[in-house]
């Protein structure tokens, strides 16, 4: 039964318009010099969304049917590893967690191609995320090494004779053992022709930069499957991430968790994950909302914050990219009609409501720092009052080990996302791509927004709620997790079929 009757909905609606008026006089700022007003941009649609009837579509939460594809990464009777390898391969990975994740998979593949021993990859500190977490802080290194013991040799650290080969060593001068010319999406032959000689001469090769440095095409089937084995089996988060993730999933599925917590003040991680206390598990969806300042600035789109916001984002764009942003040459209307603008929290709320999610939906918000803060999120929260995130679900004690660590926070969001009934992302990106591929591999429902269609619908300021719902529904019939075969140049990490899945 919907706890919000007609009287309650009228009260919520009246409070919403009070907030709108209030927001006109309240500013958010990412620095003391910025004064940016945030207010809803799609008032007509928002009014309809807040007044929508309760009760969701009967097939909304229905799992995907068997599509005739299953995981297929068994490498079969692989030949035993040679007694001696060609040397040691190091890689230095930049980017955020999921870009680094893909780089790790590529590093294993390159080590296999070269018959080399892989040193546990070094994770660079990203200037945006500012997290110094290492591989062993994020991933279960023992599981990683054990999972790959029949495929390649992996070592935690270099032997003493090569201990000089460090990040600092390569940052101070040109070194013969550093390979820095690997092209984007390099072929297997490129590595054999250019890295093998370095291994033969020095016994070690350090490849940097390495992100996106291995082709998705023209590779042996066993190399492709090895990449998927790393991604879907060998890379497992450290126990404290999976334990906390399991606790959050349990709380999302337990509708009485919060009232029980308030009444009994029970221990979060222990009592509330006790299987004997569980009721019939509920369903929940995950919304991945990548709406950070760097993404908003790089998109060059208008997000309704007025002249102050435009100037602020333009200044940030100049500071980070020195004006080298392709989107800057297009108008906001052109960018939106092409689907090149990330969706705001408000727009994602309208999108989910139009798909049929009602205000009883348990929605988990997977995000880092939303540009505009709570003022930007407030509209989404009004449409989905039962929205949660890692901060609302976990105690401060539970969050202590991951506080301020963007990669560990992203790992927790990734884990919860993989255990949700439905996943949807507000914009393309590495986390979106990684989760789409992983959930495809596991045959889990994943809504892939048609960004161009959505952008065009939001440009139509006179569109009715009924027409908005109908257009979205028709435009996403085949975008809910159906298998899509990888095309040339597409990522195996986003499209694991047919390379890593077998058609039964």
From Swiss-Prot:
Record's subcellular location: Membrane
Binding site for substrate: 288-290
Main localization of the protein described in the UniProt heading: membrane
Bilayer topology term: Single-pass type II membrane protein
Glycosites: 115, 359, 460
A single Gene Ontology CC term: Golgi cis cisterna
UniProt xrefs under Pfam families: O-FucT (PF10250)
Lineage: superkingdom: Eukaryota
EC assignment: 2.4.1.-
Pathway the protein takes part in: Glycan metabolism
UniProt KW NAD keyword: no
Molecular-function annotations in GO: glycosyltransferase activity
PANTHER family per record: O-FUCOSYLTRANSFERASE 2-RELATED, O-FUCOSYLTRANSFERASE 39
Entry's family note: Belongs to the glycosyltransferase GT106 family.
Name under which the protein is recorded: O-fucosyltransferase 39
Organism: Arabidopsis thaliana (Mouse-ear cress)
Gene field: OFUT39
């Amino acid at each position: 039964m919907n706890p919000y009757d007609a009287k309650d909905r009228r009260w919520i609606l009246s409070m919403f318009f009070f907030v709108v008026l209030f927001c006109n006089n309240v500013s958010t700022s990412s620095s003391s010099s910025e004064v940016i007003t945030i207010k809803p941009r799609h008032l007509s649609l928002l009014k309809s969304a807040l007044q929508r009837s309760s009760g969701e579509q009967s097939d909304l939460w229905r799992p995907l049917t068997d599509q005739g594809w299953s995981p297929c990464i068994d490498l079969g009777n692989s030949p035993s590893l040679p007694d001696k390898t060609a040397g040691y391969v190091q890689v230095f990975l930049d980017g955020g967690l999921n870009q680094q994740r893909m780089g790790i998979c590529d590093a294993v593949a390159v080590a296999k191609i070269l018959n080399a021993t892989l040193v546990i990859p070094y994770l660079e500190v990203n200037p945006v995320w500012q997290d110094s977490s290492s591989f062993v802080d994020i991933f279960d290194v023992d599981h990683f090494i054990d999972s790959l013991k029949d495929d390649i040799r992996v070592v935690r650290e270099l032997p003493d004779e090569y201990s000089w080969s460090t990040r600092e060593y390569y940052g101070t001068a040109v070194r013969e053992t550093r390979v820095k010319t690997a092209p984007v999406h390099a072929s297997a032959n490129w590595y054999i022709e250019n890295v093998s000689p370095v291994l033969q001469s020095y016994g070690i090769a350090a490849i940097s930069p390495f992100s996106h440095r291995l082709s998705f095409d023209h590779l042996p089937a066993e190399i492709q499957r090895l990449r998927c084995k790393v991604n879907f089996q060998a890379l497992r988060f450290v126990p404290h991430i999976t334990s906390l993730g399991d606790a959050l999933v349990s709380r999302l599925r337990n509708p009485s968790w919060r009232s029980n917590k308030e009444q009994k003040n029970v221990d979060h991680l222990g009592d509330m994950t006790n299987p004997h206390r569980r009721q019939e598990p509920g369903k929940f969806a995950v919304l991945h909302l990548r709406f950070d300042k760097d993404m908003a600035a790089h998109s060059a789109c208008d997000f309704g914050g007025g002249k102050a916001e435009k100037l602020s984002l333009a200044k940030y764009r100049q500071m980070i990219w020195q004006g080298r942003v392709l989107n800057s040459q297009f108008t906001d209307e052109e960018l939106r009609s092409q689907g090149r603008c990330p969706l705001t929290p408000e727009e994602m709320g309208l999108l989910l409501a139009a798909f049929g999610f009602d205000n009883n939906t348990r929605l988990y918000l997977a995000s880092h720092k939303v540009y505009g803060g709570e003022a930007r999120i407030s509209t989404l929260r009004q449409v989905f009052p039962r929205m949660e995130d890692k901060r609302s679900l976990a105690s401060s004690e539970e969050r202590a080990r991951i506080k301020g660590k963007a990669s560990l926070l992203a790992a927790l969001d990734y884990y919860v996302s993989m255990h949700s009934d439905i996943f949807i992302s507000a914009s393309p990106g590495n986390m979106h791509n990684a989760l789409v591929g992983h959930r495809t591999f596991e045959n889990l429902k994943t809504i892939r927004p048609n960004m161009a269609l959505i952008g065009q619908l939001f440009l139509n300021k006179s569109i009715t709620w009924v027409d908005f719902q109908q257009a979205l529904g028709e435009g996403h019939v085949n975008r809910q997790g159906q298998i899509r075969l990888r095309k040339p140049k597409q990522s195996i990490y986003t499209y694991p079929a047919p390379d890593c899945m077998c058609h039964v």
